[in-house]
Swiss-Prot record:
Gene designation per UniProt: iboH
Stated family: Belongs to the iron/ascorbate-dependent oxidoreductase family.
Residues that hold Fe cation according to the record: 75, 77, 134
Spans through the membrane: none
Protein name per its UniProtKB record: 2-oxoglutarate-dependent dioxygenase iboH
Cofactor: Fe(2+)
Source superkingdom: Eukaryota
Binding site residues for 2-oxoglutarate: 148
Pfam families: 2OG-FeII_Oxy
Domain Fe2OG dioxygenase stretches: 51-157
SUPFAM superfamilies the record matches: Clavaminate synthase-like
Catalytic activity: L-glutamate + 2-oxoglutarate + O2 = (3R)-3-hydroxy-L-glutamate + succinate + CO2
Cofactor binding, note field: Binds 1 Fe(2+) ion per subunit.
Length: 206
């Protein structure tokens, strides 16, 4: 265990516990709002006694990227819900309701978190819910000329949960995670050739 985590373990433990409670509560409320029952309720694919790839990530985007390229290429998140804490500019999203189809800045607000729907929840909902297509992008006008930091809690389904992916294939949550994670590591030019990176949302929002 890294010294920073070991020396601050109670802080990390409390943060993860609170993040998990918040995201699970949102899942339950979504299940209620969509009148889901029994095994179709979202929380029943996120049981705490089952293995999953749920994780906490500390993100750092150095200040000296090439402004001609995104700090993080357009993508949707792998899992169900993302609880994101980001006090600095840099996050953009493509709105499913905006006619211009242009990238919108997400204004950082003190005391607030950003919550994204990811691919797994989209698939578990039968694609009734939409994954958030977003990117991290530097700009000299709004983006602050400093290192950018954010904290993301990625709630993901239990690894054995099954759903239909973007191509209609039945896959496990673990398989979707593994295939998409490989795509994250590829050059942007190769990422753009696959619909895995965006979960097919770029075609829907085109």
């Amino acid at each position: 265990m890294p010294p920073t985590i070991r020396n601050n373990f109670p802080l990390f433990h409390d943060f993860v516990t609170a993040s998990h409670f918040i995201t699970q509560t949102i899942l339950m409320r979504l299940s209620d709002a969509m009148y889901l029952e029994g095994s179709t309720r979202f929380e029943n694919s996120h049981r705490e006694d089952k293995p999953s790839t749920t994780t906490l990530v500390l993100l750092h985007y150095p200040k000296n990227f090439d402004n001609a390229h995104s700090g993080h290429n357009k993508h949707t998140d792998i899992g169900s819900l993302t609880l994101l804490f980001t006090p600095q500019w840099g996050l953009q999203l493509l709105s499913p309701i905006q006619k211009s189809k242009s990238w919108l800045w997400v204004q950082p607000r003190p005391g607030h978190a950003v919550i994204n729907v990811g691919d797994s929840l989209r698939f578990l909902s039968g694609k009734r819910l939409k994954s958030c297509l977003h990117r991290v992008y530097p700009t000299g006008e709004v983006y602050q000329e400093e290192d950018r930091y954010s904290i993301a809690y990625f709630l993901r389904p239990e690894s054995a949960a099954n759903f239909e992916d973007v191509d209609g294939k039945v896959v496990s949550a673990k398989r979707w995670h593994d295939e998409k994670y490989v795509t994250y590591t590829e050059p942007h030019e190769k990422q753009d050739l696959s619909n895995i990176l965006t979960g097919g949302m770029d075609q829907i929002l085109a």
